[in-house]
Protein backbone atom coordinates (compact mmCIF):
# COMPACT_ATOMS: atom_id res chain seq x y z
CA UNK A 1 0.00 0.00 0.00
CA UNK A 2 1.31 3.45 -0.82
CA UNK A 3 1.72 6.29 1.63
CA UNK A 4 -1.38 8.53 1.48
CA UNK A 5 0.44 11.61 2.78
CA UNK A 6 2.32 11.84 -0.55
CA UNK A 7 -0.89 11.68 -2.59
CA UNK A 8 -2.80 14.36 -0.65
CA UNK A 9 -1.71 17.90 -1.50
CA UNK A 10 -0.36 19.93 1.36
CA UNK A 11 -2.85 22.78 1.67
CA UNK A 12 -0.77 24.54 4.31
CA UNK A 13 1.97 25.04 1.74
CA UNK A 14 -0.44 25.83 -1.11
CA UNK A 15 -2.18 28.65 0.78
CA UNK A 16 0.68 29.89 2.93
CA UNK A 17 0.77 33.28 1.18
CA UNK A 18 -2.99 33.63 0.77
CA UNK A 19 -4.28 37.20 1.46
CA UNK A 20 -0.76 38.57 1.92
CA UNK A 21 1.52 40.85 -0.15
CA UNK A 22 2.64 37.82 -2.14
CA UNK A 23 -0.91 36.96 -3.26
CA UNK A 24 -1.15 38.76 -6.63
CA UNK A 25 -4.87 38.09 -7.14
CA UNK A 26 -5.72 39.49 -3.72
CA UNK A 27 -3.58 42.59 -4.28
CA UNK A 28 -5.42 43.27 -7.57
CA UNK A 29 -8.71 42.96 -5.76
CA UNK A 30 -7.62 45.50 -3.16
CA UNK A 31 -6.82 48.04 -5.90
CA UNK A 32 -10.38 48.02 -7.23
CA UNK A 33 -12.64 50.89 -6.18
CA UNK A 34 -15.27 49.88 -3.62
CA UNK A 35 -18.65 48.93 -5.00
CA UNK A 36 -21.61 51.02 -3.95
CA UNK A 37 -24.16 49.22 -1.78
CA UNK A 38 -27.50 48.30 -3.32
CA UNK A 39 -30.16 50.96 -2.81
CA UNK A 40 -33.83 50.09 -2.71
CA UNK A 41 -35.82 53.18 -3.57
CA UNK A 42 -39.32 53.78 -2.19
CA UNK A 43 -39.37 50.52 -0.27
CA UNK A 44 -42.36 51.58 1.83
CA UNK A 45 -44.34 53.78 -0.54
CA UNK A 46 -47.03 51.18 -1.32
CA UNK A 47 -47.96 50.26 2.23
CA UNK A 48 -47.00 53.51 3.87
CA UNK A 49 -46.37 54.08 7.53
CA UNK A 50 -47.04 51.17 9.83
CA UNK A 51 -48.79 49.03 7.22
CA UNK A 52 -45.83 46.88 6.19
CA UNK A 53 -46.49 43.49 4.58
CA UNK A 54 -50.22 44.04 4.29
CA UNK A 55 -50.38 44.85 0.59
CA UNK A 56 -53.59 43.57 -0.98
CA UNK A 57 -54.75 41.66 2.09
CA UNK A 58 -58.40 41.62 1.16
CA UNK A 59 -57.78 40.64 -2.44
CA UNK A 60 -55.19 38.00 -1.56
CA UNK A 61 -57.39 36.30 1.05
CA UNK A 62 -60.57 35.91 -0.97
CA UNK A 63 -60.50 32.15 -0.43
CA UNK A 64 -61.11 32.68 3.28
CA UNK A 65 -64.54 34.25 2.84
CA UNK A 66 -67.64 32.34 3.81
CA UNK A 67 -70.85 32.00 1.81
CA UNK A 68 -72.11 35.42 2.83
CA UNK A 69 -68.89 37.12 1.62
CA UNK A 70 -67.87 38.28 5.06
CA UNK A 71 -64.21 38.31 5.98
CA UNK A 72 -63.09 35.36 8.08
CA UNK A 73 -62.79 31.63 7.67
CA UNK A 74 -65.15 29.65 5.42
CA UNK A 75 -68.57 29.15 6.98
CA UNK A 76 -67.67 31.62 9.69
CA UNK A 77 -70.77 31.78 11.87
CA UNK A 78 -69.18 33.00 15.08
CA UNK A 79 -71.16 36.22 15.03
CA UNK A 80 -74.56 34.52 15.14
CA UNK A 81 -73.66 31.30 16.96
CA UNK A 82 -73.95 32.74 20.48
CA UNK A 83 -76.58 35.36 19.70
CA UNK A 84 -78.83 35.86 22.68
CA UNK A 85 -76.73 33.76 25.04
CA UNK A 86 -74.81 35.17 27.94
CA UNK A 87 -71.18 34.34 28.51
CA UNK A 88 -71.31 33.00 32.05
CA UNK A 89 -72.33 35.06 35.05
CA UNK A 90 -73.66 38.37 33.76
CA UNK A 91 -74.45 39.85 37.19
CA UNK A 92 -71.50 42.22 37.12
CA UNK A 93 -72.15 45.81 35.98
CA UNK A 94 -70.60 46.76 32.67
CA UNK A 95 -68.79 49.79 34.07
CA UNK A 96 -66.76 49.43 37.19
CA UNK A 97 -67.13 52.15 39.80
CA UNK A 98 -64.26 54.59 40.17
CA UNK A 99 -61.79 53.47 42.82
CA UNK A 100 -61.82 55.45 46.03
CA UNK A 101 -58.13 56.22 45.75
CA UNK A 102 -58.46 58.01 42.41
CA UNK A 103 -57.26 61.39 43.70
CA UNK A 104 -54.29 59.91 45.49
CA UNK A 105 -53.48 57.67 42.52
CA UNK A 106 -52.84 60.50 40.08
CA UNK A 107 -49.88 61.87 41.99
CA UNK A 108 -47.89 58.67 41.37
CA UNK A 109 -47.83 58.84 37.59
CA UNK A 110 -49.70 57.21 34.75
CA UNK A 111 -48.81 53.54 35.08
CA UNK A 112 -47.61 53.37 38.65
CA UNK A 113 -49.45 51.75 41.50
CA UNK A 114 -50.29 53.73 44.62
CA UNK A 115 -48.63 52.83 47.91
CA UNK A 116 -49.82 49.69 49.65
CA UNK A 117 -52.43 51.31 51.88
CA UNK A 118 -54.49 52.81 49.02
CA UNK A 119 -55.92 49.65 47.47
UniProtKB/Swiss-Prot annotation:
Q: How does it assemble?
A: Interacts with RNMT; this interaction enhances mRNA binding and cap methyltransferase activity.
Phylogenetic placement of the source organism:
Eukaryota, Metazoa, Chordata, Craniata, Vertebrata
Ranges for the region named Interaction with RNMT are 1-55
Official protein name in the record: RNA guanine-N7 methyltransferase activating subunit
Offer an example of a GO molecular function term for this protein.
enzyme activator activity
Cellular component GO terms, alphabetically? mRNA cap methyltransferase RNMT:RAMAC complex; mRNA capping enzyme complex; nucleus
Q: Where in the cell is it found?
A: Nucleus
Composition bias, Basic and acidic residues: 62-73
User: Which residue intervals are annotated with compositional bias (Polar residues) in the record?
Assistant: 47-61
Output compositional bias ranges, type Low complexity: 89-112
Question: Which gene is this protein's source?
Answer: Ramac
The cross-references to Pfam families, in alphabetical order and at most eight, read: RAM (PF15320)
Disulphide bonds annotated for this chain are none
User: GO biological process annotations for this chain's record?
Assistant: 7-methylguanosine mRNA capping; RNA 5'-cap (guanine-N7)-methylation
State if Calcium is listed as a keyword: no
Spans annotated as RNA-binding: 56-119
Q: Where is this region: Disordered?
A: 30-119
What is the role of this chain?
A: Regulatory subunit of the mRNA-capping methyltransferase RNMT:RAMAC complex that methylates the N7 position of the added guanosine to the 5'-cap structure of mRNAs. Promotes the recruitment of the methyl donor, S-adenosyl-L-methionine, to RNMT. Regulates RNMT expression by a post-transcriptional stabilizing mechanism. Binds RNA.
Amino acid sequence: MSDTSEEIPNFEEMFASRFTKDDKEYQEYLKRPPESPPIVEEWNSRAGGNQRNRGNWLQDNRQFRGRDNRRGWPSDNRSNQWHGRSWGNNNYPQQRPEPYYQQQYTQYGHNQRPPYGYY
